[in-house]
């Protein structure tokens, strides 16, 4: 229902495989999630040197399900002579929402790409900044956007402020797009727009 009502859901392999008593469902997997995900499977294997290919590229690791799309868009399939006819990662529009399914353990870069796509589908703004500077966003009681630039390192960090005109809440100084923000070690800059 969550996806049908407009939610974005990311599901990984073995989800919906068994009930709360660990009894494996005997029908097509992933049982109760099958319609929302737009896929089914009834076979799995353990990959050895299996690459992923399609809109996403990467590597299948540890475990892989042999997915059969039933309306879902295939983002990646298995690049392997035995498994090339099966999907590995899918995206499905269901009702007003979107559901993603990862039928295998992937490499980190592939997983990040799926998560970025899902966040975009959910309307989540990605900051474009990365560790050790993490940005969090909220709205204050006046309806203004507040961004917290958190430095999670023992050395000063400098980032370029890429949003519209704003003010540093602590210093009261005006901040314009393109301004270099220096964030002391283990500190924060709070910017209000």
Regions found by a protein language model. Name each.
Residues 1-193:
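A conserved amphipathic helix/loop scaffold
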């Amino acid at each position: 229902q969550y996806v049908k009502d407009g939610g974005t859901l990311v599901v990984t392999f073995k989800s919906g495989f068994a009930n709360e008593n660990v009894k494996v469902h005997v029908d097509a997997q992933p049982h109760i999630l099958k319609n929302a995900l737009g896929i089914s499977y009834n076979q799995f294997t353990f990959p050895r040197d299996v690459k992923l290919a399609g809109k996403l590229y990467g590597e299948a690791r540890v475990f892989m399900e042999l997915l059969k799309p039933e309306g879902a868009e295939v983002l990646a399939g298995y690049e392997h002579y035995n498994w090339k006819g099966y999907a590995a990662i899918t995206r499905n529009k269901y009702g007003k929402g979107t559901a993603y399914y990862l039928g295998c353990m992937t490499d980190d870069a592939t997983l990040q790409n799926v998560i970025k796509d899902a966040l975009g589908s959910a309307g989540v703004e990605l900051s474009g900044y990365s560790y050790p500077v993490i940005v969090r966003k909220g709205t204050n009681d006046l309806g203004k956007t507040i961004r917290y630039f958190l430095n999670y390192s023992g050395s000063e960090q400098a980032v370029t402020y890429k949003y519209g005109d704003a003010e540093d809440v602590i210093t009261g100084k005006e901040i314009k797009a393109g301004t270099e923000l220096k964030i002391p070690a283990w500190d924060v800059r709070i910017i209000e727009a």
